[in-house]
Amino acid sequence: MFKITATEEHKLELIRWVDKHYHHYCLLDSNQYQDKYSTLNWELAFGTKRVLSSTYENAFEQLKKFCDYNSARVYGLLSYDLKNDTEKLSSANKSIINFPDIAFFEPEFIVTELDGYLVSEKFNLENNLSVVSDDQIHEHPQKYFKEVQTESEYIESIKTLKKHIYDGDIYEINYCISFIISEYKCNVVSIYNQLKKFSPNPFSCLLKFNNQYVISASPERFLKKLGKKIISQPIKGTIKRTDNIDRDKEELLNSEKERAENVMIVDLVRNDLKKCSETGTIQVEELFGIYTFPQLHQMISTIVSTAKKNLHVVDIIKSCFPMGSMTGAPKVR
C-alpha cells in the first residue's frame, strides 16, 4: 500500500504526471461535497489493461461483456447517440468532435482519497511524481468560442420547437447547441483546474481517451446503485445565487414554471425505472428539494427503487438512458 497526504497540490501534481505519461485516465472529483448517497470523494484511475471503443450498434451488450470480464472495474463515457441503441432512432446532426459513441477502459492503477491520504495498492505515489512548473501549464491564447448555429438558425429552431409544444407532441424540451474553438492549443489539466476553482461541483470529471478529453463540472447524479437500491436525482429548476440565499431558495421553490418542469422529469424517471425495478418499489423520496452550489441553487428530486433480481447494472443504465433532464419529455416524440 502506498500513500501520501491528500493536499490539493499533490492531487494536481499527480494529474499532471498521469496526463503526461498515460493515454487513458479518468478523474472523479466530488470537490468535498457530501450528501446521503455520497461514497466517493476523489479518485484517479489510469493506465490501460483493456479498451472498449465502438459506435452505438449493440453498444450496451458490448459494455456488459467488457464489465463482466474478470469482474473488472471500468471507467468511460456513454455518448448521447447511444439513444439509437435504446430505441429505433437515428442521428441527423453530424458530430464535430468524433468521439466514439462508447469509450471505456480498464485501468492498471487506481488512486483514491481516503482519510486525508491519497492511497494506492499498486502505484508508488512518492517515486513517480514530478512537479511541472507553472510556466509550462498556463497558456492564454486569444481565442474565442464560436457557435455552430447562427442566430437566425437558432431562432428558426425555437419557432419549430414551440410549434411542437403547441401541437402537443412534446411538452418539455432541453435544446442544446455547440460552441467550438479551432486550432486551439491548451493544457487540459490547467483548464480543468481553473474550472474546478470557478465551479467546484460534486460530479466533476476529467477523462482522457487517447488524444481526446472530456472536462465536466456537473451537480447532477444520473443514476447510482447501492446494493439493490437504485437512486436517480434529476435536476430541473435553477436560480442564480445572490447575497440573500433564503430569498433565492424561496423564489425557486415557489416558481410554478420550475416545479412543473421538475415534476415532468420526475414522472419520466419513474416510468424509466419501471423497466428495471421490482413492482411497487418506485418511490419519490424527495420532491422539489432545493440544493445550493457555488453559483446556483438547483431544484433536485430524488427517486428510488429496488432493482429486479439478477439484472445487470448495464441493463439499468440502458433502461434510463439518456437521462430525462437532458432529453426533455417525452424522450421519443
Regions found by a protein language model. Give the residues of each.
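Extended alpha-helical targeting/anchoring segments
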Residues: 1-333
